[in-house]
């Protein structure tokens, strides 16, 4: 049965307008994006098929064009629309991190990091540089590596902290494997950076490890 023939309160678009997007399932939200299904399948049926095929909404969003287009009814146009939508979300979150903003919500930082680093196929080490009142001065991606590691140079981080006249930093890097548990080398590096930056009177507030669906914070786990 086509969605247009469903009772109005069950149609995804009408349901969203009546109750807000949080009331919809992943499949219903995806169906609104898809707009139409394929012969024999409604947009909701197609959305469920996509989610079942990829395993989750996050994996669907991070699928390659070839993987995405392997599903009947999906192609370059839908792939482009999806990634345009994701980029809009990234940029909207990034606007929340304007110069001079005070960091008050750990969750907003995590959301930004997931959208910015969670999908990267290689490790990226980045840093928020903050002033004495913990307002944002700059966000920089400093080092890029392989699937399993990024070579990090404490001296370069110290140079950037001095360049920005930062009083504090939040460190972040991603684990492309999706496992956000810190490795022994992550713990050792964090200690080294804390010591090195302390000599410059720069405080390391946190170190966050970013996966596709989760962000691990050293601070909240008592490792700072």
Swiss-Prot record:
Entry keyword set: Hydrolase, Metal-binding, Metalloprotease, Protease, Zinc
> Hydrolase: is it a keyword of this entry?
yes
Q: Which GO terms describe its molecular function?
A: metal ion binding; metallopeptidase activity
* InterPro entries assigned: MPN, RadC_JAB, RuvA_2-like, UPF0758, UPF0758_N
- Say if the entry is tagged with keyword ATP-binding: no
Q: Which residues bind Zn(2+)?
A: 173, 175, 186
> Protein name, please?
UPF0758 protein Rpic_2712
**Which parts of the sequence form the motif JAMM motif?**
173-186
Matching Pfam families: RadC (PF04002), UPF0758_N (PF20582)
| Species name | Ralstonia pickettii (strain 12J)
């Amino acid at each position: 049965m086509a969605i247009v023939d469903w009772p109005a309160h069950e149609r995804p678009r009408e349901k969203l307008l009546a109750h807000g997007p949080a009331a919809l399932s992943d499949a219903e939200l995806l169906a609104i994006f898809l707009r139409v299904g394929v012969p024999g399948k409604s947009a909701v049926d197609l959305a469920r098929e996509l989610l079942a095929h990829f395993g989750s909404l996050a994996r669907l969003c991070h699928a390659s064009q070839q993987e995405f287009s392997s599903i009947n009814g999906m192609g370059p146009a839908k792939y482009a629309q999806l990634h345009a939508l994701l980029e809009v979300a990234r940029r909207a979150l990034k606007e929340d991190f304007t110069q001079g903003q005070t960091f008050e919500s750990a969750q907003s930082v995590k959301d930004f990091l997931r959208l910015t680093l969670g999908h990267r196929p290689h490790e990226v080490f980045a840093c928020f540089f903050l002033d004495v009142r913990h307002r944002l001065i700059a966000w920089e991606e400093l080092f890029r590596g392989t699937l399993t590691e990024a070579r990090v140079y404490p001296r370069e981080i110290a140079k950037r902290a001095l360049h920005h006249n930062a009083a504090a930093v939040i460190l972040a890097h991603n684990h492309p494997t999706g496992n956000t548990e810190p490795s022994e080398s992550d713990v050792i590096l964090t200690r080294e950076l804390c010591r090195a930056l302390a000599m410059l009177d720069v405080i390391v507030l946190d170190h966050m490890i970013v996966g596709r669906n989760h962000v691990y914070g050293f601070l909240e786990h008592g490792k700072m």
